[in-house]
Amino acid sequence: MFTLRVVLFVVLLCISNFLVAADPWLTIEGNDGLGKGQHIVFVTGEEYYRSEEGMSMFAKILSQHHGFKCTVLYSIDPNTGTINANRNDNIPGLAALREADLMVLFARFRQLPDSEMRHIVDYVNAGKPVVGIRNTTHAFRYPPNSSSPYKAWDFQSKDWPGGFGQQILGDTWIAHFGKFQKEATLAHVNATQRGHLVLRGVADTIFCHTDVNSVERLTSNDVVLFTGQVLSGLNATDPPVTDQRKDTRMPFAWFKTYTAPSGKQGRSFTTTAGASLDWINEDLRRLMVNAMLDLTGHTQKIPTKTMVDFVGDYEPKPTGALSDEVWTAAKLTPQSFGIKSK
């Protein structure tokens, strides 16, 4: 009987540990730093740019180097419990936004259940700060016959022109200005904003593997920090294109003061960079972290050269959509992106 009790205790303990480890999101407690006592929630869900890698990497940097508690949410296949960015209808853990000091959103064409979507809507309606990355300009898509109360957040909305992207970030999806996976980006600092505190320690140019996106609807009130130039190839040494696009640079990184549907105002920061390979660039990482420090109230304390070293290994995967079979075989869980014990 004693042996049986021991066996049952061990089994229950293993089950308990499994359940604790099986949360469909990743939470990393913060060390000491400017962000001590604050909470950043990263919301991922897009098929091309490995947002699950890049945002998990930033969560490690912000928590370990700067003190923020960080939670990363993922698109989860409820049938397997693993990450599958093709599942556009399930991002568990969005209730964490209730206590978030900053939402970092990296999503594309999500159609979330109203019970999940309302957490994003409530967060924005509170006028809280938002960071939008790459295809977050078209984060949400609803079918024409949708009865959702959040249908107006669709990237093609006519009722709330351009939906979330245009109204909160500054623009919705238009087109690739550079050729997708064929032409990289060289971003140039806006000389009139060189003294902006978010640009502390950031170089005048930033190379990105991703192509330039068209951005055409920013206003004179939006603050553009960098503009993107189309390169003729995918290497930093490739020259700019020489066709009709040669003299056009698109907004690459900017701040906006938005007005939410509630009437409250808030601030957002957006960049059209975002592939996991892009974050290899230290200056781009510093720009992002500085922007997050700014949006969480630490503008005057942004360091001369903000620490953005990787925490652990960072081995980004190439850009491109993956099949459901590939996602299932990968068996990635939120804990796959946690801080590994040495």
Task: Give residue ranges: language-model regions.
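Helical hinge/lid and interdomain linker segments adjacent to catalytic or ligand-binding clefts
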Residues: D23-D32, V41-V43, E47-F140
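Nucleotide donor/acceptor-binding cores
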Residues: Q38
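Bacterial N-terminal signal peptides
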Residues: V6-F18
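Non-transmembrane alpha-helical segments in soluble domains
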Residues: A59, V121, L199, V289-L293
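Extracellular ligand-binding/catalytic regions of CAZymes and related secreted enzymes
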Residues: A22-G35, G54, Q64-H65, S232-K342
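Catalytic beta-strand/loop cores that center a nucleophilic Ser/Cys/Thr
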Residues: W25, S63, K69, N88, ...
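N-terminal secretory signal peptides that target proteins for export/translocation
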Residues: M1-L4
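A glycine-rich, often tryptophan-bearing local segment used as a flexible ligand/cofactor-contacting loop or short
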Residues: L105, R110-G201
